[in-house]
Amino acid sequence: MSGQVGDLSPSQEKSLAQFRENIQDVLSALPNPDDYFLLRWLQARSFDLQKSEDMLRKHMEFRKQQDLANILAWQPPEVVRLYNANGICGHDGEGSPVWYHIVGSLDPKGLLLSASKQELLRDSFRSCELLLRECELQSQKLGKRVEKIIAIFGLEGLGLRDLWKPGIELLQEFFSALEANYPEILKSLIVVRAPKLFAVAFNLVKSYMSEETRRKVVILGDNWKQELTKFISPDQLPVEFGGTMTDPDGNPKCLTKINYGGEVPKSYYLCKQVRLQYEHTRSVGRGSSLQVENEILFPGCVLRWQFASDGGDIGFGVFLKTKMGERQRAREMTEVLPSQRYNAHMVPEDGILTCLQAGSYVLRFYNTYSLVHSKRISYTVEVLLPDQTFMEKMEKF
């Protein structure tokens, strides 16, 4: 039995009836207390009554905190409306709405410097509620229940800037909230135009997805436009995505429905930097340097760092060791990222590097040019690994 309305086993029927009885006190506050809605929570917790009830009650608290009953009337800040790259456009053959997220043209740092994290998350929750409303409208129009949505992630232009830690943490928080509060609404998450870097990005967020959600991720290869029409009819796909749909003025991107984002103008910035917490603090003495070594086991891994200095600027560069097991001077190693001085005492620095070969990479902080003052640095360094399954799939494209 699928666990869907009309296809329940006797034990599932019994669980549904008991579940409804257990949550009588909140039924009237639910957005739609019918069997379809209740079964979403039971399915998400494999019909475990206590876990399903706990999940639903936590969601009710979430609804109050986010004021979801009124969120469709809420207007996001202008910068979010203009540059948060997403939109609803078209339906699949079963009537499910299609939501686009144009990740490759998103400017995560610009958005987080121009709006609060809560405003950006709230805009995402608003999109979820818009999708649920569209499902209801489709149900009325088609005379059958439409419960699920298709998500298309466009990754053309995905780059190292998209692995910026605060931006990834925002995405992790969104997926965590999505799993907890919008169970069983995703039919497929289709990824198109994915560069190899996607395997690293996916590995950073997959732990915030349920196993069921991860199974719904579909990566389309070079022939993605034709493959996409197997999921969605061409007349429901923008020309930009291989279909025939255009805006009334003929625009192939359907800009009236999908926001493609772009770089956020600095005129929108509310602050100069996003506050970060660092894992390590060390002193770099006058005329000396500090080496932070990281072992990279295979090509395709990514080094990500953030640092700030106190007491003046600090020099920084990245090197690859030529001999294992011993400390080397800078001139004895291969320079991977050219060394230069950074005003990290004024503006914290962050950076990302794709490691093209295995080996020991050294992040070198240097104060060799200062004969009087020592510097104090705070830093975080991480090695980001690609998801091996997706990396193998993408290498076949």
Curated annotation (Swiss-Prot):
Stretches assigned to the GOLD domain: 252-383
GO cellular component terms listed in the entry, alphabetical order: cytoplasm
Residues in CRAL-TRIO domain copies: 76-249
Source species, domain of life: Eukaryota
UniProt xrefs under Gene3D superfamilies: CRAL-TRIO lipid binding domain (3.40.525.10), GOLD domain (2.60.120.680)
PROSITE patterns documented for this protein: CRAL_TRIO, GOLD
Annotated protein name in UniProt: SEC14-like protein 6
Lineage of producing organism: Eukaryota, Metazoa, Chordata, Craniata, Vertebrata
